[in-house]
Amino acid sequence: MSNTAAELFRSARLACWYSAWAAGACSLDDARDAVVGADAAHDVLGLRDEPVPLVLALGMLRATGAGVATLALPAPGDLTGLGGPPEFNADALEASEAVLLPSSGLGLVPTAVGAGVTWQVSPAHESHTVPDLVEADTALRETLLESSARLADLDVPRWRPEAAEGLQALRHPAGEPLPAGYGVRAQRAAALALRCLGLCDLALDDDGGAVSAWEAAERRDALGRLARAARHALVAACSAGVRAA
């Protein structure tokens, strides 16, 4: 597990390390440890009448024929990575994340319960909206340039110095947040996407320095576009599987 792996959404961790384990790129124990991270424990609902510990659930899911997992990070008006049915989409949208196992027709949605996490397994259709990695990576970099220029015009350093520092740090995103076996482009795209999402969360926290409602709306629009591009890039990277370019 890399130093930056804990920054991944829980569903991103599960999608990546499940795919890596299924491909033989990591051990079952390593996959379990990476997914659980700092949480107390992860249990899976819907495979048996009682909750199943994650380490056992991974094997049960593999037995269904699921070889690759894909990620969804839905937001209102953006269901990229989801394929239905509506009930699963609604649960994923409420959680803002989900894992799909296309070969088995199943999906998982996490819920934090105290210091632990439960995953609900439900029927889920394969998504045909998972972004292409090259296209999503390129789109993120183009959106970052555009958003940076717009935010600079809106005097970001004055209203949010931490955001200005974050923009500078985006020039050199560090670490490889995905498991070994994922390609260089996937690692690079995921690292940049995580930095961008962190920046957007910080900068959207308040409009304290906005001098007008128009300026505040412009900032939210620029950051919203960047967050959407970052989500798509992270979905593409985490869904690419091991040995992706």
Locate predicted features.
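N-terminal intrinsically disordered, low-complexity regulatory tails that precede a folded domain
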Residues: 1-99
